[in-house]
Amino acid sequence: MADLLSVPLKKPSEVDIVNPLKNLIQSRYSTADQPEDYSEQINEFSKLRNNAIWRAFEKYESSLEVIYSYYDQLVSLETKVPAQEVQIPFKWKDAFDKGSIFGGRISLTISSLAYEKMCILFNIAALQSSVAATQSVENDESLKLAAKLLQQAAGIFSHLKSTVMLSIQQDPTPDLNPDTLGALSALMLAQAQEIFVLKAIHDEMKDQIVAKLSSQCEDLYSECLKMFQRENLKQLWDRDWIATIAGKQAGYHAIAEYYQSLVCKSNKIIGEQITRLESAMELFKAAQTRSGKAAMFQDFANKAQRNLNEAKKDNDFIYHERIPDIKSVAAIGKAQLAKIVPLGYPLSQNFQDLFSELVPVVVHQAMAAYELRKNEIQNGEISKLRDSTQFLNRYALLVYNLNEYCSQTNLIFSPNYNAP
């Protein structure tokens, strides 16, 4: 492959989600006249979680659909049960922590579906990067899949960066730090642009296009390198990550110069062609030195060296053009095809909600508020009716007593009697 960097997965811990969910749903939704039993669905949900969190470590494309389904189920369930009442202690370990010699690891436990969702999203993006890294550069469909997954991963890390602190409301593990997530999003985007460069070369696109794509790739790796070298982050990464990024930044600058030299060659601008090839050779050597990989971009370096020898020979015998300084030549244009793909829902292709019959919590709360208000109105009206009934009863008793009194004193009484 193109020596892509893949993000390590967060390590989960097994938890009992069956009993807490069963108790919560029964207490919230089940009544004496309408008992609710979701035991089967809850057991399936538990199996789905176990399958998703452990299948991710197999790092196959088929594992993506499994973890997508679990994420979709989490999103759906979060709308149907009160988040503050979920008492499931989800524990996740930091993805970049190697542990000490005593076996200790950085971890965080939070009883929150939102936290579980954040960790699953991190692992989705990490798995996408791993699957992308296994794709072949010789196959067009593989290149398309790699570009798609890397852009989606960039979107997920970007989404996590902006939402994680609000979701968990406490200090996260280092892998979920917003600065870390921003750096990972930048890395995924740079690698996606790299895939577009490789596809353009594979498709034999015009030299000018490849040069512009490579120039943009160099810019993205340069920005990525700045983030990875921050003091609060650089201790997180594997030993060769920063070196690889620095090497690719120089390497894609070199490739941009190489392909721009081919444009100069086709336009018979031999002096500039030689300048760009000389610059490309220096950059290829810098890429190999920075990365610590002597073979990095070696095939391109060999092509550039052959072209440089031929160009110098032609210039010495035919053109005799002046060789300009690399700083004086026109800047190479840029073309960015890699984009951050926003997180969508659902992620899985055929998502089926296990709890489709559960009323969303907002609807349940609205219905509860409706029932409460209805009872208040009904009780108020009944109270008014009782008061009116008591008044009429007292009035009727008064009339009866007056009639009795009048009959005993030979007086005539009528409620409608008008005195003269």
What residues fall within each predicted segment?
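Structural register within alpha-helical repeat arrays
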Residues: 117, 124, 131, 189, ...
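Eukaryotic intrinsically disordered, low-complexity segments enriched for acidic and Ser/Thr/Pro residues
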Residues: 1-114, 175, 203, 207-209, ...
